[in-house]
Amino acid sequence: MFKKFLIFIVPILFLSACATKQDTFAQVNQISKNSQCSSCESPGGFEAKIKGLLYISDVGIQCCANKRTLDTGIALKKVYLHRFYDLKEGQKVLNAKGKKLFVDVNFNAVFYTYLKQELEARGIVVLDNNDQNSPYVSKIDLEFISYGATQDAIGLHSKLVGVLQVSDINKNKKFTIRTKQDVQGFDDLKETTFYTHLLIKQMANKAASLISEL
C-alpha cells in the first residue's frame, strides 16, 4: 500500500513525540469533533483556539457536510486507495530557532488514515482492494512533494505539498494540493507530531473534497 524512499542524510537532531501514534490520532479526531465545521471548499481560511494557541490554516479541520455529495439518490461512489508515496527522510525537517529537527512522522500512512475517514464521511465507499478490476472504481494515488516547517518567536509555520491522482475508465486527473498552518505561541517541540497530523489532515480534507466533486 505504501512506498517509502530512504536516503542518507546529514545527522540532525532527532525529534520524537511523547504521545503514541494512537494518542495523536485520538487527539486530532477529538479536536475535529470539537471544532466548528467549515466548508473545505471555502477560500476564506480557518481560525481556532487549539490547546490554548491561535491556529490559522487555509482549510478547516472539520468539514461541513456537503449535501450535494451526500445525495442518496446518486449511485454510491467507490474508490480504491492505491499508493501513497512518503516524503524523503531529508525533507522531514523542522527548523527550530537555528536547529534542524527530524520530524518522525510517516506522512503517507497518516494521510491514508485521515483520507479514508474523510471519504467515508462524505458517503464514499472505500474499498480495501480492486481485485475485480472494476473500471468504475476510482484509483487514488498521492505523492508528497515538499514539506517546510519553521519555529520562530511568533510560533510554528508549516507548509505541505502533494500531487493527487484520480483515475478510472472515465478520467485520469492530477491535482497539486497545497496546505499551510500557523500556530501562534507554539514553543513546545513535543507537540510537533500533533500539529503535523493536523497539517496532514488538512491535506486529506482538500483531497476528499476534490474526489467527492469528480
UniProtKB/Swiss-Prot annotation:
The keyword Signal applies. It is a lipid-anchor. PROSITE patterns: PROKAR_LIPOPROTEIN (PS51257). A lipid is attached at C18 (N-palmitoyl cysteine). A lipid is attached at C18 (S-diacylglycerol cysteine). One of its GO terms (cellular component) is cell outer membrane. This is Outer membrane lipoprotein MapA. It comes from Campylobacter jejuni subsp. jejuni serotype O:2 (strain ATCC 700819 / NCTC 11168).
